[in-house]
A protein has these predicted regions:
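Conserved ABC transporter NBD signature motif
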Residues: 62-100, 150-154
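Conserved ABC ATPase "signature" region
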Residues: 69-73, 145, 150-177
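Short coil-to-helix segment of the ABC ATPase nucleotide-binding domain corresponding to the Q-loop/switch region
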Residues: 131-140, 147-148
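Helix-to-loop junction immediately C-terminal to a conserved catalytic motif
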Residues: 54
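The feature captures the beta-strand-to-loop junction immediately N-terminal to the Walker
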Residues: 39-41
């Protein structure tokens, strides 16, 4: 069984009164233990595909299955994004902001999958600046341990086992002193 499966994935962005389709009908599967690379020229949709696989961005259409869970099963993706009536001001300009509103059940499903199955390394530096390396690694584990629906094996670790695991990870990537 594939750990990641995309089927007929699409993503469109509004551009004025037009719509730009950044991803058009992408389908592929990644099996457990398989190495995959997404390549292409700038603007070809690579980051958009990764953001959808990482459950950071919603597809406009299609399906994503992660470790057997159909992420958007039972959800009409075209209804998920709505206009928000809040206004934000920056530099005196008032602009309407869009935000994605997800049904509570889907939000829980996505959060659970992110915590138990996904890891994401961004191009930009996205650590929590007030935390050290150890604490940045520990933080998602603390969140996960509070989630009753979590299925991570780390949930069963004792405090000392978690400390050992975090130190192992730090050493593995060469960040020890």
């Amino acid at each position: 069984m594939a750990v990641v499966s995309l089927k007929d994935l699409h993503k469109s962005y509004p551009l004025g009164k037009e719509s730009v389709e950044a991803v058009k009908g992408v389908s592929f599967e990644i099996e457990k233990g398989e190495f995959a690379a997404i390549s292409g020229p700038s603007g070809s949709g690579k980051s958009t595909i990764l953001n959808m696989i990482g459950l950071i961005d919603l597809p406009s259409a299609g399906s994503i299955v992660i470790d057997g869970t159909d992420v958007y099963e039972g959800v009409n993706l075209s209804d998920a994004e709505v206009e928000n009536n809040r206004w934000s001001s920056s530099g005196g300009d008032k602009k309407k902001k869009k935000r994605t509103v997800l049904p509570a059940k889907l939000d829980k499903r996505i959060t659970g999958l992110r915590r138990s199955h996904l890891g994401f390394i961004f191009q930009t530096f996205n650590l929590i600046p007030v935390l050290n390396v150890y604490e940045n690694i520990e933080f998602p584990l603390l969140l996960e341990s509070k989630d009753k629906n979590s299925k991570s094996p780390v949930d069963d670790f004792t405090k000392s086992q978690k400390e050992e695991w975090i130190n192992f990870l730090i050493e593995k990537v060469g960040l020890t002193d």
